Amino acid sequence: MNASDNGDGPRLVLARHGRTAANVAHILDSRPPGYPLDELGEAQALQLAARLAGWPLRAVYASRAVRTQQTAAPVAAAHGLPVTVLDGVQEVDIGDLEGRSDAAALALFDEVYRAWWLGDLGARTSGGESALDLRARFLPAVEEIVGGVTDGDVLLVSHGAAVRLAAAALLGETAETFYVPNTGLVVLRRDPQGWALESWDTAEPVRGDVTAGGTPA
C-alpha cells in the first residue's frame, strides 16, 4: 500500500510500535509510559519512516506510551507533522499481571487473550481490562481522528493486542486476526459502508512474542 493508491475515502494506518527490551524479555508491559524502544526498535522506527515517506499522511498520532511516540517521531518529522498523543489507544491493561514475565503470568494472559478470539470479549485478567473495555475507549478515539478527514492517510501508532482488537471491531469481526510484528501496519479504508481492509502486515511470530497469542506489547 503506498501513495499511488487511488481509492476513495480516508485510510486509517494502524502501526505497532518498534521493539523494546520488554518485548525481548517477555515482560508484560501494558501501562504508560512503559519501556522505551531498544536499539533495534529505534532502527525499525527509521525504517518505518522510510517506508511511509511517499504516503499522503494528514496526521500522526501515538498512544501515551513512550515506545509509540518514539516510533511515530521519525515518520512525523519526515512529513513535517507533529506527533499528537491520543488518549484511549494505549495497550489493553493487564491488571495484576503488569510487569511480570514468569510462565504462570504469561499463561494466564494467554488464556484470556485466546478467550477473546473465541468470542468471550468480556474475559479479563484480575484487575485488568476486557476486549470490550478496549473497544469502548479505542473506537471513539478512531472516530475523533478520522471523522473529519475526507482523503489521505491518518497514522496511529499503537500496540500489538490493541491493534488486533480494534481492527477486528472496525471490520465487524470477532474471529482471530493476524499477528502484527513490530512496526507492522494494518491499513483500513473508510467508505460510506464502513471500514474495509486494504492490507495487513504479518510474519512468523518472534519466539515468545505474546501478541502472537498472548502478551501485550
Residue ranges and their predicted role:
Residues P74, L165-A169:
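Active-site signature of alpha/beta-hydrolase-fold catalytic machinery across serine-
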